[in-house]
């Protein structure tokens, strides 16, 4: 179930403060965050945010199409390596 519409989108206060500071100075640098549940808001467009995937930070360049989505949607936590392949047989067939 999604978040109640009367509450509005969740925005991490620390991340919002960093974005506002970068927009004010006009600086462009990578921001590291663990806030995967933060909603992408219009002020973030054009910035690169490194979102933690549980192991490392994945850099994500924010575009207009991403506004309204969550940061965690763009940093997958699981790596799919495919289903089991036929392993070489280790025993000798008779």
UniProtKB/Swiss-Prot annotation:
SUPFAM superfamilies: Ribosomal protein S19 (SSF54570). One of its GO terms (molecular function) is structural constituent of ribosome. Residues 73-94 are annotated as: Disordered. GO terms for cellular component: cytoplasm; small ribosomal subunit. It holds the Pfam family Ribosomal_S19. Protein S19 forms a complex with S13 that binds strongly to the 16S ribosomal RNA. PANTHER family: RIBOSOMAL PROTEIN S19P FAMILY MEMBER, SMALL RIBOSOMAL SUBUNIT PROTEIN US19M. Belongs to the universal ribosomal protein uS19 family. This is Small ribosomal subunit protein uS19.
């Amino acid at each position: 179930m999604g978040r109640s519409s009367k509450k509005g989108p969740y925005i991490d206060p620390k991340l919002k403060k960093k974005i506002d500071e970068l927009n004010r100075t006009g600086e462009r640098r990578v921001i590291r965050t663990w806030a995967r549940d933060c909603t992408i808001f219009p002020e973030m467009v054009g910035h690169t945010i490194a979102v933690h995937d549980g192991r490392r930070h994945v850099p994500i360049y924010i575009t207009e199409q991403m506004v309204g989505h969550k940061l965690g949607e763009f940093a997958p936590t699981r790596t799919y390596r495919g289903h089991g392949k036929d392993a070489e047989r280790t025993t000798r067939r008779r």
